[in-house]
Structure formats: C-alpha cells, structure tokens
Amino acid sequence: MIARRLVSVPLFATVLAIMAAPGRADDAACQAVLQAVLKQTAAPVHQKVTIETAAAPDKPMHNEMIRLGDTLYMQARGQWMARPYDAAKAADDARQAMTKGEHSCTRVRSEAVDGQPAELYRVQSKTATGGSDSQVWVSTASGLPLRQTVTMLEQGTVKLKHEVRSDYTNVRAPADVSR
C-alpha cells in the first residue's frame, strides 16, 4: 500500500511536503529548491525511483514515472499506467505545502550528477511525529532537480528511504500502457 501511494504521487510533492514552513520559506537555499521543484512541475521528465521501507529493508522497490504534457505514466511491478496530470495544480499544491511544518535548508556544495554540474541542497523537516532529511541536486544549467534522496523518520526511527533520479532528455511515453 505505501509503495502504491508513493508511486501515485509525483515526487516533487514529496520534497515540498518535507520542506513546508513559512518561517524559512524565504531562505535562499529553500527558495532555490522550491524554484527547481516548481520548474519540474511543467517539464517533461523520466524518473527512476527506488524505495526502501523499514518493513522490508533488504527488498527495495524500483519504479519509474514519466510526465509528458497532461499525462503521468507510472510503472510499478513491470506494468505502466497512465493518469491525468495538471501542472498548474501541481505547482499550486507545491506552493501551498510551504505553509506547513518546520524546516531548514542548506546549500551543501557543488557536485556533479551523471556528469552534469549541480548544486547539492540539504532539506530537513520536523513534524509532530518525526520528520525527514533530504538531499536535492539541482542542475546549474537547467535549474531542474537531477537527483533527490529522502529519509523519513517517525519517532526517531527510519520508516522510509527513497531516491529519485530525473532525466529530461528524449522523454517519451512508454509502450504498453493500461488506462
């Protein structure tokens, strides 16, 4: 169930959910991450996702997502599905997420991702039951997220880890899609 829910939500929302707080929303590092995530809402992208849960730490799940225009394609357990996607709504949801929780953002360093120059940011959030620690690599050329890692905590215990790698070149709809 948790994998299905995570795969059905665009990954940029995950980053925004973890960095939601008005107190630091104007911080330069937080703004850089937010701008990258907002830009990603409208960009064609192919994402490869790895998810590890506390319940099955040695059995990572591998999924893919492709966003093209008004369609989000999701692959889980080898099967592709298509769902409607609204970039404007996704951007609005991202902006609204900035009003929740408590977070801090830090620019860590310049670091290449698959040969592409990028800036690495660390985003930490706190919630009533735990929080998360994320790293987001933003391309210096395009301003889009290239890689994201998130560790979600609940009462000090790791509940979930996921990594997302994003590719913006030659993005095409998958063959064999069920609707």
Where are the regions that the model predicts?
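N-terminal leader/targeting segments and the immediate start of mature chains
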Residues: I2-A55, A173-R179
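Edge/loop elements at the starts and ends of beta-strands within beta-rich repeat scaffolds
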Residues: L38-V45, D114-Q116, A141, K159
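An acidic-aromatic
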Residues: K48-M98
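Short loop/turn motifs at secondary-structure junctions and domain boundaries
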Residues: A56-P57, G101, T127-G130
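A short, amphipathic edge element
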Residues: Q96-V108, R165
